[in-house]
Amino acid sequence: MEERKNKHLFRVAFERYTSEILVIFIGISISFFFDEWRENRANDEIVKEHLTVLRTNLVQDTLNLAFQIDQGNKLVDSINKLTYSESDAQLIDSIDYHIDKAASYLTFTSNQMAYEEIRQTAHTGLIKNDTLKTSFLTYYTAVIPYCTEWCKIDETHTMTQLIPEMSIYFSVIADSLNIVSSQEKVKAIRMKKLRNLLLVNSGFKKVTMGALALTKRATINLLKKVDDELRK
C-alpha cells in the first residue's frame, strides 16, 4: 500500500516536473524565435538604409559617367581635327579651342559613401541576395578600379607627354606674355612628334571611354538590382 502510494507520488511529481521543463523549454524557444525575428528585422532595416544610400550614389555615378563619355567624344573629336584636317584655314579660327580640348583628360570619381559605410561596419554579410552582393562587390573592387586606372593612364600621358611637348611651341594655358599666332600653332601641330603624341593620346582616350562605357553599364545593372531589392 505504502509502495503504491510512493509510486503515485513519484509519478505525479515527475509529470509536474516534466510539464514545468516543457513549459520552460517552449518559453525559451519562443523567446529565441522572437529575438531572431527582431534581429532579422533590424538587419533588414539596416540593409534597406544602406541600399537607399547606395542607390543615390549609383544615380550620381551614372550621370557623371554619361557626362564624361560625352566629354570624351568632344576631346577625341578635337584631336581628330588637329591631326587630320588637311587645310590650315579649317584650323586657324578654332585652333585654341581644339588645343584646349586635346590638353584635357578624362576623369571619374565614384561616390563610394555607401560602399565605405558597408565595408567599415562589416555589413556586407547582411545582404541576403547573393546575386546583389556579388554585383555590389564586383562593382567596387573590380569595375571601378579598372575605370579609374584608365582615367589615370589618360591623365598621365596628357600631363607628362602631350602637354610638355605642346609647351615647347606655345602655351597650353592662356598666357598674355607668351602670345603665339594661330598660324604658328597650326604649324607646330603639323610637326611629326607632336602629331604622333596626339594620335597616341587619342588612342588612350578611346580606351578610357570604353572603360567608362563598361562602368556605366555595370552601374545601371547594379542600380536595377538595388531597385528590385528595395521593392521587396
Where are these regions (language model features)?
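Hydrophobic membrane-insertion alpha-helices, especially the h-region
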Residues: T18-F33
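Long, hydrophobic alpha-helical segments that serve as membrane-spanning/inserting helices
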Residues: M1-E15, E36-K232
